[in-house]
Amino acid sequence: MENQDVNSNETVFDPPVGITNPPIDELLTKVSSKYALAIFAAKRARQINDYFQSIDEGVLEFVGPLVTPEMHEKPLSIALREINADLLEHTEG
């Protein structure tokens, strides 16, 4: 959504919505390719999701989030923040 600034001719955009924090460009410096990032983040998001499900079942056999999750934050967003904070080590293969 764009708005026109009253005092100038500049166009002002609303803040972006979606996975923009951390920025994808920063995340790509931590892995070899965008495909590796997608697989790495998806696997970690699955582990986080399994952890939250195991809490509901009373069984704690998975590693939970390594960063403090925000309210209603999705597992993929948590995984991307962990990758950006260098809390996880990515190995090829």
Curated annotation (Swiss-Prot):
Enzyme class at the top of the EC tree: transferase
Coiled-coil regions listed: none
Keyword Transferase carried by entry: yes
Gene Ontology process terms (BP): DNA-templated transcription
Molecular-function GO terms, alphabetical: DNA binding; DNA-directed RNA polymerase activity
Domain of life: Bacteria
One Pfam short name: RNA_pol_Rpb6
Record-level GO cellular component terms: DNA-directed RNA polymerase complex
EC number, UniProt record: 2.7.7.6
Keyword Membrane: no
Catalysed transformations (reactions): RNA(n) + a ribonucleoside 5'-triphosphate = RNA(n+1) + diphosphate
Keyword list, A-Z: DNA-directed RNA polymerase, Nucleotidyltransferase, Transcription, Transferase
Stated family: Belongs to the RNA polymerase subunit omega family.
NCBIfam families with a match to the protein in the record: rpoZ
PANTHER family tied to this protein: DNA-DIRECTED RNA POLYMERASE SUBUNIT OMEGA
Function summary: Promotes RNA polymerase assembly. Latches the N- and C-terminal regions of the beta' subunit thereby facilitating its interaction with the beta and alpha subunits.
Quaternary structure note: The RNAP catalytic core consists of 2 alpha, 1 beta, 1 beta' and 1 omega subunit. When a sigma factor is associated with the core the holoenzyme is formed, which can initiate transcription.
Protein's UniProt name: DNA-directed RNA polymerase subunit omega
Encoding gene per record: rpoZ
